Amino acid sequence: MGKAIEELAHFAAATPWETIPSGVRAHAKLVLLDTLGVILAGSVQAEVAGVRARLTATGGRGATVYAPGWPATDPRTAALLNGLAGRSIELCEGHRYVSCQGAVQVLPTALASAEWLERSGRETLAALIFGYEVAARLGAGLTARPIAHQNGQAPLLGAVAAGARLRSMTGAQMSLALRIGATLVLTPGYTNAVAGATALNVAGGMSGFAGALAPELALAGVAAQPNAIEEAFGQLVGDGFRAEAVTEELGHRWEIARNYFRLRACCNPIYAALDALEEILAEVEHQ
């Protein structure tokens, strides 16, 4: 198995809370609150409510679905539903330098797993921080195919890391969970967005599902091939994988602190054009 993947897995599993800089912790709280607000707002979308009604009809317990009435279901389904809701309104945060909407795909696993396992708020926030770290760093290493969307790809493995962290898994166990997770990554395309296909948001929700599932598979004894991540990202869903990007400034540069918050329901490359349009319209109105 690759040295970089092992180093990242051990870092995410074993780094103490106390070593996280206070500024990073404070910023992570904002990311958590912003993402939770987006999940709640997205929960009332018609298709999200429809999926929720169908998937919670068979029962389940252990985790809250952040939606009107606060329904409960099993942690995997709750993570899926909360992730779907968060991706449905295009207000989830993103990473400035990597194609990675990490928080909305990592946090649902962290919330559902922490509730089920009765973990503390500090442990939940740490899971978000380290899950985001894994998502962004693997995303930096991944050479995406031209029309590939990041939903259900590197952020899915970030969710797996969050789930593993909350289960107090060792570095070796987290590595196994991540490599199992590599068999679950998805293949959504940006063409979904152009076509108005909201199935793209389901791929984001599935990150939460996989994040709650893969650690349990690892603990149950499921085996994974040593180079599963490198193969998946380098040859299958991706077009190359740079291992050196995974550990660049690891422990010194915290990826969650390099995010951006969305103030408009669109991806950040469009913001400058919308800002300019607003200024133009304001000038026209005053003429």
Q: Model-derived features: where do they sit?
A:
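A conserved active-site cap/scaffold subdomain adjacent to cofactor or substrate pockets
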Residues: 249-287
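N-terminal core-entry segment
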Residues: 1-257
